[in-house]
């Protein structure tokens, strides 16, 4: 069984919860979420992200044999809600990505590109929500933000709204940008009920979302049907959103999301199921049509879905962290680390760290003094953004920087 861990575990009610990145040529047995007793290390449960014949979801694979169901990974950190005792985790694309080679583009291929809500004691899937049937390597494993908020989506900016919402009602929700499409989704935490969703950066893969059911309709113009087809896909396989983390401030009830204005000219390279060919696509990146800046930060209200502010810049944006003092810290692919005003987006401070700020910034206090720490060095996301702005030439040094706050 081949698998690897690309992110750390979490602790949930005395258990170590771990997702994993299924290797492209691994079997379905690698694609699992596991819980181990934190005291003994004994495995408590494991949940498969690819159903076996006869299990719920098996029928969504279009008759594809179990041994040819590959790569529904859970390669980023889950979230845990102690009140409901549920774990929330996101999943990735299948291999190959184009579904015409994998039983048909009309099949769901559960549980790829979904949010899974698991009982922390048993690993049972309590509910799931599929964000998109993915033909392009637009994974959805990123952070799920757990928030209690009033819900009043503004139809002027929020494209898809559940008509049953009572504006102003308080809900315990999961929100954020869970996938590379850059679409914000807000779901009820207990039930998975779809509440609202909206795009951010340019996207052309979703035509609509049914507000009443949450069902996503894929743009048929973006679906591959044969080998050697080339299509403009937005965002590209590096996002939109990617693993660089967003942030949330309860003081402003606002989420802050690092994104890239990127698309790709994706071409199908095979009509066969072969894990050695991985996604079955060539995916050269490009700037989104009409864009000149690669990086952007969206500040979005968790209550209304409105854009509070937006920052754009030539260099790609990487991870963010919000502080209680009204600041959002974040780095970019050109080595700049900066502090934004969390209400206005104004850049209040900036320093050149010399190489891409690829690490996740953290803030902590020692003896009453607050600090912000971050690491630098090359990464896949920084590199893909850098190719869109080749006049910027950061270094490659891997360093740790710690800054004291006033």
Which sequence ranges carry the predicted segments?
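Noncatalytic, solvent-exposed loop/strand surfaces
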Residues: 1-406
């Amino acid at each position: 069984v081949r698998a690897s861990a690309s992110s750390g575990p979490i602790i949930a009610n005395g258990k170590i919860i771990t997702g994993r990145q299924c290797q492209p040529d691994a079997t379905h047995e690698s694609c699992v979420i596991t819980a181990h007793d934190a005291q003994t290390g004994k495995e408590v449960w494991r949940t498969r992200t690819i159903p076996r014949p006869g299990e719920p979801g098996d029928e969504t694979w279009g008759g594809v044999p179990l041994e040819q169901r590959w790569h529904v990974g859970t390669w980023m950190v889950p979230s845990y809600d102690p009140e409901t005792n549920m774990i929330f985790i996101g999943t990735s694309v299948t291999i190959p990505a184009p579904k015409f080679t994998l039983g048909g583009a009309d099949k769901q291929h559960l549980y790829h590109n979904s949010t899974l809500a698991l009982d922390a004691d048993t690993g049972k899937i309590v509910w799931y929500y599929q964000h998109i049937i993915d033909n392009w390597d637009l994974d959805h494993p990123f952070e799920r933000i757990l928030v209690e908020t009033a819900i009043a989506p503004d139809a002027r900016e929020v494209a898809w709204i559940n008509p049953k919402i009572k504006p102003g009602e308080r809900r315990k929700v999961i929100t954020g940008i869970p996938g590379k499409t850059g679409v914000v989704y807000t779901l009820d935490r207990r039930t998975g009920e779809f509440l609202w969703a909206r795009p951010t950066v340019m996207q052309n893969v979703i035509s609509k979302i049914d507000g009443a059911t949450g069902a996503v309709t894929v743009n048929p113009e973006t679906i591959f049907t044969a080998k050697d087809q080339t299509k403009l896909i937005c965002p590209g396989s590096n996002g939109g959103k990617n693993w660089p983390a967003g942030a949330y401030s309860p003081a402003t009830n606002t989420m802050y999301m690092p994104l890239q204005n990127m698309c790709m000219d994706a071409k199908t390279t095979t009509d066969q199921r072969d894990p050695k060919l991985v996604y079955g696509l060539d995916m050269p990146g490009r700037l989104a049509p009409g864009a000149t800046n690669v990086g952007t930060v969206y500040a979005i209200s968790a209550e209304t879905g409105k854009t509070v502010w937006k920052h754009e810049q030539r260099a790609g944006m990487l991870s963010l962290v919000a502080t209680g003092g009204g600041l959002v810290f974040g780095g970019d692919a050109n080595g700049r680390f900066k502090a934004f005003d969390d209400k206005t987006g104004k850049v209040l401070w900036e320093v050149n760290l010399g190489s891409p700020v690829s690490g996740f910034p953290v803030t902590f206090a020692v003896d009453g003094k607050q600090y912000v720490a971050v690491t630098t060095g090359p990464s896949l996301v920084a590199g893909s953004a850098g190719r869109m702005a080749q006049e910027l030439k950061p270094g490659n040094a891997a360093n740790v920087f710690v800054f004291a706050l006033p």
